[in-house]
UniProtKB/Swiss-Prot annotation:
Record keyword DNA-binding present: yes
CXXC-type zinc finger span: 162-211
Role of this protein: Transcriptional activator that exhibits a unique DNA binding specificity for CpG unmethylated motifs with a preference for CpGG.
Example GO BP: positive regulation of DNA-templated transcription
Quaternary organization: Component of the SET1 complex, at least composed of the catalytic subunit (SETD1A or SETD1B), WDR5, WDR82, RBBP5, ASH2L/ASH2, CXXC1/CFP1, HCFC1 and DPY30. Interacts with SETD1A. Interacts with ZNF335. Interacts with PRDM9; this interaction does not link PRDM9-activated recombination hotspot sites with DSB machinery and is not required for the hotspot recognition pathway. Interacts with histone H3K4me3.
Compositional bias (Low complexity): 153-163
Gene, per the UniProt record: CXXC1
Subcellular location as annotated: Nucleus speckle; Nucleus
Domain remark in the UniProt entry: The acidic domain carries the potential to activate transcription.
Name of this protein: CXXC-type zinc finger protein 1
Upper classification of the organism: Eukaryota, Metazoa, Chordata, Craniata, Vertebrata
Organism whose genome encodes this protein: Bos taurus (Bovine)
Residue stretches of biased makeup (Basic and acidic residues): 90-120, 337-347, 361-370
Amino acids binding Zn(2+) 1: C171, C174, C177, C210
Location of N-acetylmethionine modifications: M1
Amino acid sequence: MEGDASDPEPPDAGEDSKSENGENAPIYCICRKPDINCFMIGCDNCNEWFHGDCIRITEKMAKAIREWYCRECREKDPKLEIRYRHKKSRERDSSERDGSEPRDEGGGRKRPAPDPDLQRRAGAGTGVGAMLARGSASPHKSSPQPLVATPSQHHQQQQQQQQIKRSARMCGECEACRRTEDCGHCDFCRDMKKFGGPNKIRQKCRLRQCQLRARESYKYFPSSLSPVTPSESLPRPRRPLPTQPQPQPSQKLGRLREDEGAVASAAVKEPPEATATPEPLSDEDLPLDSELYQDFCAGAFDDHSLPWMSDTEESQFLDPALRKRAVKVKHVKRREKKSEKKKDERYKRHRQKQKHKDKWKHPERADAKDPASLPQCLGPGCVRAAQPGSKYCSDDCGMKLAANRIYEILPQRIQQWQQSPCIAEEHGKKLLERIRREQQSARTRLQEMERRFHELEAIILRAKQQAVREDEESNEGDSDDTDLQIFCVSCGHPINPRVALRHMERCYAKYESQTSFGSMYPTRIEGATRLFCDVYNPQSKTYCKRLQVLCPEHSRDPKVPADEVCGCPLVRDVFELTGDFCRLPKRQCNRHYCWEKLRRAEVDLERVRVWYKLDELFEQERNVRTAMTNRAGLLALMLHQTIQHDPLTTDLRSNAER
């Protein structure tokens, strides 16, 4: 059974006149139905047809089957087994079917009679031997001329090519397999993009082609070696160009480079019946001619067959003996284009850059070849050769030379530094003086805020000692319009102005407690009391950094007793203190809600600002001192130098800067 299982063959001519569903219609498959309007597969032993749905075989699965037998035949003869085809033969058969397979009257494909000999030849291995076998088995092609090698060598080569896949043509032991870099001079390397070629051959470097498993046409043969036999190595006259096309398809040379405009007169056209249905040819399907094969192995990829290698100066690396034995091919003269010139210039520039990179990346290559070319060590009194890629023979020589340089240069630089004043040094001193003045003012401000803090605590303590007056007017806002409403800044609800402060304070505490402000370290400030909350949160592993008096998350307002006085200091004209206190009960006073907490928060916030200012000034002072220290250090004196053109004038500043 062939790989494409198609619809069954139509019935005989006598059955065409009968109805398809009639009584005399042929029946198929294990279901014994005459239905032929679906995918079917035939047994290669009993020639019985079966529906794919009944035996659970799809059309895609049938394409991978070479011979299929039904269950009854396999039970009768256990030697019958379903055979599957390889991927290469499957693709080749599908391409042959698309071009030349006969079709029946209903549009379906007919299954040709299986030919075991042809299948055995089609399943042969790759290589020259397999190509010759397939070429002789083709009914449309004449048998090719025999090669010089003996039949035993051909059989051995066929077995070797069958065992070796295309993707594993490396023995790993020869010199070509152990080579890791491209030569950059052969035709395959010059075709690569990294060497400026068009990348159309797409083969490995010839020096990296395995000498045991690679194709003969890809191997590198120097002038001393030759892939041909001694009988063929003798010089022979070149074959003249054919004046008329000869009907021998075995003399074609594979794929020609159409885009380069090369026309090979030695390649003869195929007969009309072969070219009527074009099909993609692989390297295995191409027949070979012995003479052309020897010429191809000798020098098919020389400067005549590769148009982009037409420069004589660039093709000098090819062996002249191989060029003489190359196939004579006609070329069509191409027009000179600017793109080709640009490619040549780009290739030359790339070669120069590559040589420069190799020189710096691998300096030990040239040194290893010529030990006498190694430079002498630069160490003091050392006569040894320097290490590859270094100026010294060892680390000790480098350290000795560096120490001698310091002893010789540093005293002179220190003397120059002391003689001429440094502008940056003077600017640094002025900046330090300004920073110190700002630090002093910040400390004074901090002391003032500490004094205000203690004064506030004294005022709060004295206010709590005041007596509550019941006869004092407690409803000062009753005369206002009771219909007036304002909106809360936190929740946006309308509220009465009399209770606005109380409502807004509670709303703020509720929303503020939903967010945490923390640091990984607690605050430690000498002389500061009651500044940050600093409550440790074990979940986030942080310390709370809100003000202690305003933190709604870790502190709550104490419960106010009924007889506690408000005690808020009364003012005149907003800022002028009168010296009196509010003596209303704290529960009834709506004007001075939480006045102690707000006053304490005001003082604490100002103290925090002063501490931040001091911290910033300390950081500036540290940076300036570090710069001044490094300016006269060893590294700075060795790297930088100021040249004094007038030795009598040591001060290089202008009169305005002095």
